[in-house]
From Swiss-Prot:
The chain crosses the membrane at residues 13-33, 37-57, 86-106, 109-129, 137-157, 159-179, 207-227, 232-252, 267-287. Carbon 2 of the heme B porphyrin ring is defined according to the Fischer nomenclature. GO terms for molecular function: protoheme IX farnesyltransferase activity. This is Protoheme IX farnesyltransferase 2. It catalyses: heme b + (2E,6E)-farnesyl diphosphate + H2O = Fe(II)-heme o + diphosphate. Its EC number is 2.5.1.141. Pathway: Porphyrin-containing compound metabolism; heme O biosynthesis; heme O from protoheme: step 1/1. CDD domains: PT_UbiA_Cox10 (cd13957). It is a multi-pass membrane protein. Keywords: Cell membrane, Heme biosynthesis, Membrane, Transferase, Transmembrane, Transmembrane helix. The keyword Phosphoprotein does not apply. It holds the Pfam family UbiA. Converts heme B (protoheme IX) to heme O by substitution of the vinyl group on carbon 2 of heme B porphyrin ring with a hydroxyethyl farnesyl side group. It comes from Picrophilus torridus (strain ATCC 700027 / DSM 9790 / JCM 10055 / NBRC 100828 / KAW 2/3).
């Protein structure tokens, strides 16, 4: 396997893509954003590097538990005692290049937000929270909020009601998304002594908290109806209404079907579509009527 293939394998490409889409949505929500396409390319470059770097550091720290879990066991074939130092150097170079590029070619505020996302994932979530508390993904989910702040700031050098709305939309969504996934890996988490919610409180109690979190998320998603300072365009609200209804349906299915793990997996996959469609709804602010 080539070095490029190995890097792709351990950098959690799906997370990087989501982070880039969040940043792009916030970027395009800025009035006049289409006049700053060069800045968008720099933002994507810097954000991608930081996200990939964070994933590598996460994998380095979790080298002791990844082989015990089916979902992550293949990473140990790439990242081991012989290759750890090399990947540490690569990850360090990535995050430094990300910071310097965004600082010089965009602005210090954007670079600070990118670095904040990196630090919250590596330090706050991976090192401090993941192995200590079942609230790991709730608090650590703040890492997913920083791309929205960086996206807006890459043009304006500031924050706004819109960028904060997008940032906390991702934050509210993360527990619903990840808890549905973790139900399917509950045995691995128990084996690895990782206190993910299903491993601590059981599947039925986890479904209860998924429903609670989803209810909060759905209510939060319609906030632009009541706060005029949040600018997300005319198409966002009808898309949010449809996706909210579908999300409630999918996350309620496990409870209706006797907590079938397949339903949790379907809810996990739909939660990806949910967030993608809401972000696309925000991007469609560019469509003028």
């Amino acid at each position: 396997m080539s070095m490029t293939s190995q890097i792709m394998k351990i950098t959690k490409l799906e997370i990087t893509i989501l982070i880039d889409i969040v940043a792009i949505a916030a970027f395009l929500a800025v009035p006049g954003s289409t006049n700053h396409i060069y800045d968008l390319l720099i933002l994507i470059f810097a954000g991608t590097l930081a996200s990939m770097s964070a994933s590598i550091f996460n994998n380095i720290y979790d080298m002791d538990i990844d082989p015990k879990m089916k979902r992550t066991s293949s990473r140990s074939q790439i990242l081991n005692a012989n290759t750890r130092s090399l990947f540490f150097i690569i990850a360090t170079a990535m995050v430094l290049l990300s910071f310097v590029t965004s600082f010089i070619l965009l602005n210090p505020v954007t670079s600070a937000f990118i670095l904040g996302g990196f630090a919250s994932y590596v330090l706050l979530y991976t090192i401090i929270l993941k192995r200590r508390t079942s609230l790991n993904i709730v608090i650590g989910g703040i890492a997913g909020s920083f791309p929205a702040l960086a996206g807006w700031a890459s043009i304006t050098g500031s924050v706004s009601a819109t960028s904060l709305f997008i940032a906390f939309l991702v934050f509210m969504w993360t527990p619903t998304h990840f808890w549905n996934l973790s139900v399917n890996n509950v045995d691995d988490y128990k084996k690895s002594n990782i206190p993910m919610l299903p491993a601590v409180v059981g599947i039925k109690r986890t479904e209860f908290w998924i429903m609670v979190n989803t209810s909060i998320l759905v209510i939060y998603s319609i906030l632009p109806l009541f706060i005029k300072e949040i600018h997300v365009g005319l198409l966002y609200m009808p898309m949010a209404a449809v996706m909210d209804a579908l999300l409630i349906y999918y996350v309620a299915r496990p409870m209706i079907n006797n907590y079938n793990k397949k339903d949790f997996k379907k809810a996990f996959h739909f939660s990806n579509m949910y967030m993608l469609m809401l972000l696309i709804g925000i991007m469609l602010i560019l469509v003028k009527f």
